[in-house]
Curated annotation (Swiss-Prot):
Expressed in stems, caulines, and senescent flowers. One of its GO terms (biological process) is negative regulation of DNA-templated transcription. Residues 24-44 have a biased composition (Polar residues). A motif (Subunit association domain (SAD)) lies at residues 101-124. Its main location: nucleus. GO terms for molecular function: DNA binding; DNA-binding transcription factor activity. Residues 7-23, 156-166 have a biased composition (Basic and acidic residues). Belongs to the NFYA/HAP2 subunit family. This is Nuclear transcription factor Y subunit A-4. Keywords: Activator, DNA-binding, Nucleus, Transcription, Transcription regulation. Transmembrane segments: none annotated. Heterotrimeric transcription factor composed of three components, NF-YA, NF-YB and NF-YC. NF-YB and NF-YC must interact and dimerize for NF-YA association and DNA binding. Stimulates the transcription of various genes by recognizing and binding to a CCAAT motif in promoters.
Amino acid sequence: MTSSVHELSDNNESHAKKERPDSQTRPQVPSGRSSESIDTNSVYSEPMAHGLYPYPDPYYRSVFAQQAYLPHPYPGVQLQLMGMQQPGVPLQCDAVEEPVFVNAKQYHGILRRRQSRAKLEARNRAIKAKKPYMHESRHLHAIRRPRGCGGRFLNAKKENGDHKEEEEATSDENTSEASSSLRSEKLAMATSGPNGRS
């Protein structure tokens, strides 16, 4: 009996919803066209709630640290099969405040170097001090080179070019008349064509 009562009440509610006048559910169209051509879902749709993106970018992890971070939101799904990149492997270092991400090859290379250094220290072998520069002659040459603004090296071409421009400026005053006549003759020949006709 109770199931039949529920069915009757459900039918009455759905029938009451169907009996709403069209003015409440569809907007009036002043141009005389039928109002069925307008999509009512787009007019009355509610704004969509935006959720957290489950795959945060590892480079912005510190910026979005307040949000809950799950490295693998779907435990049964392998990210490699989905074509997504896995986040980098953080280094095991106490001095780093935030994790530094490297790829797998870099990580294994770092581990190999650490192991070899640990073996050398265990054998009490002194680690060679690195030279401050590779070649003494290059260092001495760099010391002798002239430097410009900001400590950068000056190019020899630019230095020679600057001196040549100054010399040319003084000599151009003396020969300005001769050069202007040569330029005008070259211009006249270029405009006249190969046979001397314009």
